[in-house]
């Protein structure tokens, strides 16, 4: 049923993706409808990965509550790592300094996570291999060139790949792959929000309000994963998270086409505006 609903939304949007004249409401804009579904899915996947991680660790690793906390903390810390990285451009550093900071800041943030966990959990040496996943995020960020659509496509593709790795493998590789979903979720909100409200004109504020309403996905998608976990097991239930990342990837492709039909090439507009798409 969910697949049918998503398919209908995409079909409806694509069929009216041309230039909009005499729009009577924000819902006349395909990008707004797509943005609403994307925010719903984005918040849902962000919350579901973190909220079900404790159960995953109990079932697959046999850990108790005192051991679980540092891994859950690492997931939410990953959100911080990504957001600190994305915020660098807001300080207007020179290009050479920015490149250095994009490499250094994520590991500074990771150090903060490690220190905080060491104060509570003691030994955190088993978290150190996660630095490899941070390295992947840094390379992805450079590859995105800070363009919202490009960043969205790269990060959602990696999020889907890492989640599938988490489902198909075992041990720390699987665990860290799932936790890295936090890294690849961390910078999606501003990209989705910017794309969903692009070209809305006088309806921009209304569109923003509609998008914010869709954070209710964070209360629905985790419940769906819980039901899947009951039927198929907690590890397999994370395929739902992979599907969410895949939908966000598709959103990026479709909304870019929708905006171009309206005469808006979003990534080019960002470059003209100084490269600060988020």
Residue ranges and their predicted role:
Residues 50-53, 186-202:
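Intracellular juxtamembrane helix-capping segments at the cytosolic ends
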Residues 118, 141-145, 242-278:
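Multi-pass alpha-helical transporter architecture, strongest
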């Amino acid at each position: 049923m969910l697949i049918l609903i998503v398919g209908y939304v995409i079909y409806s949007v694509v069929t009216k993706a041309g230039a909009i004249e005499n729009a009577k409401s924000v819902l006349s804009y395909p990008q707004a409808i797509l943005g609403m579904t994307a925010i719903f899915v984005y918040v849902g996947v962000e919350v579901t990965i973190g909220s079900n991680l404790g159960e995953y660790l109990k079932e697959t690793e046999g850990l108790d509550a005192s051991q679980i906390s540092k891994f859950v903390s690492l997931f939410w810390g990953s959100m911080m790592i990504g957001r600190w990285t994305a915020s660098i451009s807001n300080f207007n550093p020179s290009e050479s300094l920015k490149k250095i900071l994009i490499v250094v800041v994520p590991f500074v943030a990771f150090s903060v996570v490690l220190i905080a966990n060491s104060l509570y959990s003691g030994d955190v040496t088993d978290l150190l291999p996660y630095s490899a996943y941070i390295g992947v995020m840094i390379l992805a960020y450079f590859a995105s060139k800070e363009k919202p659509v490009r960043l969205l496509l790269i990060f959602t593709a990696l999020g889907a790949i890492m989640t599938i790795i988490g489902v198909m493998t075992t041990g720390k590789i699987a665990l860290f792959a799932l936790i890295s979903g936090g890294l690849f979720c961390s910078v999606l909100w501003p990209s989705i929000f910017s794309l969903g409200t692009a070209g809305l004109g006088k309806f921009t504020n209304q569109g923003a309000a509609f998008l914010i309403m869709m954070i209710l996905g964070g209360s629905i998608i985790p419940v769906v994963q819980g039901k899947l976990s009951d039927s198929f097991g907690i590890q397999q239930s994370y395929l739902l998270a992979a599907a969410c990342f895949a939908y966000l990837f598709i959103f990026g492709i479709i909304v870019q086409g929708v905006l171009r039909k309206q005469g808006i090439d979003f990534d080019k507009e960002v470059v003209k505006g100084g490269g600060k798409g988020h």
